[in-house]
């Protein structure tokens, strides 16, 4: 990866910028733009990633840690093509289940780290190498994981 010379501080700054580039507006009740609970959007995204064979699917609860978003959804595709397919599946299934569409999707060109910004929910889909490099779980180590019953 070209970013391997970045310092820890630069990585954190990059992650914060990438995670919150499209919006920094939150509602007090953690509702999405259409009034759906942010947790429901996060769970729908996680289920969609799992359904598309995403690996290590997690939802980090940031409600007590961040003023910008409430949940991170993390998933890994085995390669660029699968990661891109996971993003498509999440976009479709979250729209069906919650009536939500992302404000923006970043990283579609490189397909190593794609980010879907739903406002109070930010979805990160990685290739294995990018997930290992950025380690968002470590950067947000204080964030509890939502228990998921992925079927």
Give the positions of each predicted feature.
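Long, contiguous binding/interaction regions
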Residues: 1-59, 63-64, 81, 85-88, ...
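Short hydrophobic/aromatic beta-strand micro-patches
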Residues: 74-77
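Short amphipathic alpha-helical segments
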Residues: 69-71
């Amino acid at each position: 990866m070209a970013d391997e010379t970045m310092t820890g501080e630069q990585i954190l700054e990059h992650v914060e910028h990438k995670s919150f580039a499209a919006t920094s507006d939150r509602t007090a009740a953690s509702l999405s733009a259409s009034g759906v609970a942010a947790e429901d959007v996060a769970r729908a995204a996680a289920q969609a990633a799992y359904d598309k064979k995403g690996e290590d699917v997690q939802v980090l609860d940031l409600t007590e840690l961040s003023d910008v978003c409430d949940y991170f959804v993390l998933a890994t595709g085995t390669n660029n093509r699968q990661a891109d397919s996971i993003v498509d599946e999440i976009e479709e299934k979250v729209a069906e289940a919650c009536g939500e569409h992302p404000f923006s999707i970043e990283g579609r060109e490189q397909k190593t780290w794609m980010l879907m910004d739903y406002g109070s929910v930010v979805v990160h889909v990685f290739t294995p190498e990018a997930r290992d490099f950025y380690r968002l779980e470590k950067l947000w180590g204080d964030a509890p994981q939502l228990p998921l019953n992925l079927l």
